[in-house]
Amino acid sequence: MLRRGLLSFFMVILIDRGTSQLYSSDMCNWKGSGLTHEGHTKDVEQVYLRCSEGSVEWLYPTGAMVINLRPNTLTSAYKHLTVCIKPFKDSKGANIYSEKTGELKLVVPDGENNPHKVYCFGLDRGGLYIEATPQQDISRKITGFQYELISQRTLSDLHTVSDPCRPCSDTEVLLAVCISDFVVKGTISAVTNDEELQESLINVTVDKLYRQKSKIFLPKDNGGWEGMIRTPLECGVKTGMGSFLFTGRMHFGEPRLGCTPRYKDFKRIYLEAKKQGLNPCEISTD
């Protein structure tokens, strides 16, 4: 490798060849063209990104590249991160693999086109290896995706991504209330199931808005708030069923359902923890 330390925050070098390339890159996003790679199809490009979220866009892919993802704070904690990628609509022209010490595992095959599907794996597998597939005509071929790094030590993050239908433990509920992107008390007024995307879109009528980082829930004319949350279809969410405490995270710009206990159960859990001095944060239960 050529001076990896000097160039680690940007798209950097070719392995085996030192020809200069024209790319746009910052710490979070990378965009480049395979047209500058023609004639060097056996070269493997190295890209270094230092961000918790961003995007990669490879126009006219030829040859291969390795995407090295790390958080913007380099500590040993990066080994406990989950990488999630969401391919762009109509992304094509290359296979995407996870890579660990030379071993490749196919994550997204070329041509698999589901604009809402998200692929996740542990960062301890290493980087992403993207290999262009043989093409007679590379024009109009673009391989691209968004990525997010999610802490496996943050229980609400891990629950939302890896096992969204599993009921949360008391500890997970208490932590979710403190660190989720949205926390509301409300009821399920409608559920729309999308068989193609294998998702349910939950319409929530909100009685009490504790927190939201994005404008998920908007005021209603007759008081309260209303908004939509996504969850996998397999979770079997139904309308009615009483009052809940809804928590969750923004995931690729969409609100995803996290821990959602019945409100009466949350109130019991919270008050018991508070009595013992074990509640990680304060929240009104009136």
From Swiss-Prot:
Where is this protein chiefly located?
Answer: secreted
| Coiled-coil segments | none
* Signal sequence, renumbered to the chain: 1-20
Q: Which residues are tagged as glycosylated in the record?
A: N203
Would the keyword Chloroplast turn up in this protein's UniProt record? no
Annotated compartments: Secreted
Write out the entry's keywords from A to Z.
Disulfide bond, Glycoprotein, Hormone, Secreted, Signal
Q: Which GO terms describe its biological process?
A: brown fat cell differentiation; energy homeostasis; negative regulation of inflammatory response; positive regulation of brown fat cell differentiation; response to cold; response to muscle activity
* Disulfide topology: C28-C51, C84-C120, C165-C235, C168-C259, C178-C281
Q: Name one GO molecular function term.
A: hormone activity
Q: List cellular component terms (GO).
A: extracellular space
- On the tree of life, the source organism's domain of life is Eukaryota
* InterPro entries in the cross-refs: Meteorin-like
What role does this protein play? Hormone induced following exercise or cold exposure that promotes energy expenditure. Induced either in the skeletal muscle after exercise or in adipose tissue following cold exposure and is present in the circulation. Able to stimulate energy expenditure associated with the browning of the white fat depots and improves glucose tolerance.
Per the record, the similarity remark reads: Belongs to the meteorin family.
Tell me the protein's name. Answer: Meteorin-like protein
